[in-house]
């Protein structure tokens, strides 16, 4: 029976199409590292700076394009305005494959989401973010594009204001629609901003309602602590991953499994990745291989030279999705997630370092069942 399931899921992977929907924006990154922080407070001055880097941002670009680079068949679903920034987003995506823009919707009513990333001399990055079209992305934008797909991944519900309206009912309806078509569902998060709409949601109440319709949920340590362990997050901040041990991860992922997911996990940055799975019947219900049922593991990160961590969590999710869809062992799934994240952080942007699935497997010595 195990062999039958394994072969069945392997065949499904070869024919699969993954939809990545949600947050999509353009990052504008001016080179201002030569300007001291104090000079930013001096109004009316002309400061000579370096060139601006233009990069795609958000889960749709980061996870979606990582999946594309790994060789998966992927559809990107987002919303852009009919404006110059929207044109830039479309052009940047089309450089990878013109077909990838087929499900990017355009609108005349909302300006395209963007962020300006500023890193003054000797300081950490600051983000100036315009929600725009990301906040306006609606359920119908996604459900229109589900035909023929086998997996739906939604990136960053805290930023998807329209989907989170009315106690996240549009988001929940979208997930239900996907599962009713026998699609596997997953979501990725961001840390809620206490000064923005995402910081006003009652996550301890809403998350169980959402996760009842999610099959795979692997947030970062900071994200899940901010949502379900706010006291710990207040103490640890973005260094949560350094404080989480086996017992903490086991208990927290146990809560996520009780909320309904089939595969729960925590992305732990330089400390690796923890995964825990539900029982056999739940995995079959999620269209996932039952051979990984009732397991848990902690996979250490791979030692690489880090140039930038932008998109590392998104890249990790891409590796996890590919491994799960190919019915690999839980060890292989976790290793592939960590390996794709390792490739990501070796470059300054989110996608440039991602290699093909074969190249990634060979480089990191990851076992693969054909």
Q: Could you say what each language-model-derived stretch is?
A:
Residues 181-190:
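Short beta-strand/loop segments at the ligand-binding rim of alpha/beta enzyme cores
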Residues 159-168, 197, 227-228, 235-236:
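Glycine/threonine-rich flexible loop motifs
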Residues 157, 190-194, 222, 269, ...:
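Active-site beta-loop-alpha junctions enriched in small/polar residues
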Residues 9-22, 176-177, 209, 228-370:
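Conserved phosphate-binding/catalytic region of the ribokinase-like
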Residues 39-54, 69-158, 360-370:
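Conserved N-terminal subdomain of the carbohydrate kinase-like
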Residues 96-99, 200-227, 290-295:
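Structural recognition of alpha->loop->beta junctions
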């Amino acid at each position: 029976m195990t062999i039958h399931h394994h072969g069945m899921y392997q065949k499904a992977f070869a024919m699969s199409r993954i939809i990545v929907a949600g947050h999509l924006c353009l990052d504008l990154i001016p080179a201002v590292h030569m300007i001291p922080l104090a000079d930013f407070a001096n109004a009316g001055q002309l400061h000579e700076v370096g060139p601006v880097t233009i990069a795609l941002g958000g889960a749709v670009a980061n996870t979606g394009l990582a999946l594309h680079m790994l060789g998966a068949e992927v559809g990107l679903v987002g919303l852009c305005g009919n404006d110059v920034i929207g044109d830039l987003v479309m052009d940047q995506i089309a450089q990878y494959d013109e077909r990838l823009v087929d499900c990017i919707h355009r609108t005349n009513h909302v300006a395209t989401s963007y962020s300006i990333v500023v890193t003054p001399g000797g300081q950490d990055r600051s983000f100036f973010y315009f929600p725009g079209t990301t906040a306006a992305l609606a359920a119908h934008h996604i459900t229109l594009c589900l035909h023929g797909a086998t997996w739906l991944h939604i990136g960053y519900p805290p930023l998807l204001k329209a989907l989170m309206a009315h106690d996240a009912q549009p988001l929940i309806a979208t997930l239900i629609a996907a599962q009713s078509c026998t699609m596997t569902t997953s979501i990725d998060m961001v840390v809620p901003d206490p000064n923005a709409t995402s910081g006003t949601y009652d996550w301890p109440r809403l998350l169980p309602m959402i996760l009842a319709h999610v099959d795979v949920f692997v947030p970062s340590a900071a994200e899940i602590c901010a949502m379900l362990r706010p006291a710990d997050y207040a103490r640890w901040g973005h260094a949560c991953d350094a404080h989480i041990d086996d017992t903490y991860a086991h208990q927290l992922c146990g809560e996520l499994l009780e909320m309904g997911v089939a595969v729960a996990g925590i992305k732990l940055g330089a400390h690796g990745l923890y995964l825990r799975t539900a029982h056999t019947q739940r995995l079959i219900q999620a269209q996932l291989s039952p051979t990984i049922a009732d397991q848990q593991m902690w996979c250490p990160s791979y030692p690489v030279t880090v140039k930038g961590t932008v998109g590392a969590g998104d890249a990790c999710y891409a590796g996890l999705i590919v491994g799960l869809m190919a019915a690999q062992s839980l060890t292989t799934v976790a290793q592939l997630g960590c390996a794709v994240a390792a490739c990501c952080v070796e470059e300054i942007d989110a996608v440039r370092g991602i290699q093909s699935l074969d190249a990634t497997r060979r480089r990191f010595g990851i076992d693969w069942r054909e």
